[in-house]
Amino acid sequence: MTEHVATRIKRSASSIFHLAPEDLAFQKKVRVFIDQHVPQGMAMWTQRGDWFKALADQGGWDVPKWHKDFGGPDFTPTQRYIFDLEMGKQPTPPQLPFGVGMLAPILMNYGSKAQQDRFLPSIRDGSVNWCQGYSEPGAGSDLANLKTKAELSADGGYYLVNGQKTWTTLAQIAHWIFCLTRTSSDGAKQEGITFLLIPMDDPGVEVRPIITLGGSHSVNEVYFTDVKVPVENRVGEEGKGWTYAKGLLAHERSGLAGIQNSVMGLEKAKRNAQKVRVGTGTLLDLPSFKNKVGVLEAELLALEFTELRTLARVAAGGDPGPESSILKLKGTEIQQRITELNLEAAGVFAAPWGAEAFGPDFAHGATQSYLGGRATTIYGGASEVQKDVIAKNVLGLS
């Protein structure tokens, strides 16, 4: 039976749903827009500004998760799903997630009017890059154990920040960092945590690169030495940062599922497998390989429905909730398994590292993608942490 799973699981959640006429019209509108505006090839990088302007001109499509009060499109859950699905069907210019998808919801919910007016416009147009200052050497999965200290000055005008963050993604290009700091050690460790916004060009901020297993430089260590942060850069109340961070982590984890990218990546892996001759057929014809593909397609379909339930909760005014841990856990596992399929298809041609490529074009970089993908089940909360969250908050286990 499993040999035929791949041929039976062909539908996405959208094809199972009976879309209302207005949703079908919206889907057509998105498809026409993509056909007319998406840059191709290298233009994806040189014409990024034009792409995002065109999205903005559609009424907030450049910030699809934002509320209409802040310039977002106010999509229904179904429209949001359709939009993500259609945008994920082909490569589109990337938008860094830290400002638009992570910090912005915190500012909208907990920031002052002055902070919203100051930061949201530059977050939206991409002129200012942000990074996330959460993890520390002794506070990764146990994030509430963080030690970076922020002391309020005697006159109450600024915080003096000292400490270290690690695994800080894209800190090397960030203009600002939103940072969890400890302002008090009294009470439970989740208490006394304060959410600060810190400029990266302060002379007391130092960024040191970390080269990952895949050979890339995307994460860093960030050191703070006597950094003065004006009190107006504090988001919300002092000592309430943990509450704000939990909401941000839920948004981050649901976004890390990367469902549409996985759908596109799996289709690419299938095309690659069709190029590999095995006996009288192709690698994709092998029952063992076809079964792996079919299982992934089935799991992706299940994950799509979980995402839709999460979107419906958010649209009703709630947080993503503990189900975001399911999205993060399964979504990142699927991402890793797709890199394994590409590695299997590349075979011995994936072996060269930094040397001149040979063999099929898709083989070059397959090993780097596989190794780099090992981190997906760690960042944003390790899989073990997500399982604990699911056990306690979804299954009700103690």
Residue ranges and their predicted role:
Residues 95-114, 140:
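N-terminal glycine-rich flavin-associated loop
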Residues 126-134:
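A short, Trp-centered hydrophobic/proline-enriched beta-strand micro-motif
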Residues 148-152:
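A structural signal for short hydrophobic beta-strand segments in well-ordered beta-sheet cores
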Residues 157-208:
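A short core secondary-structure module
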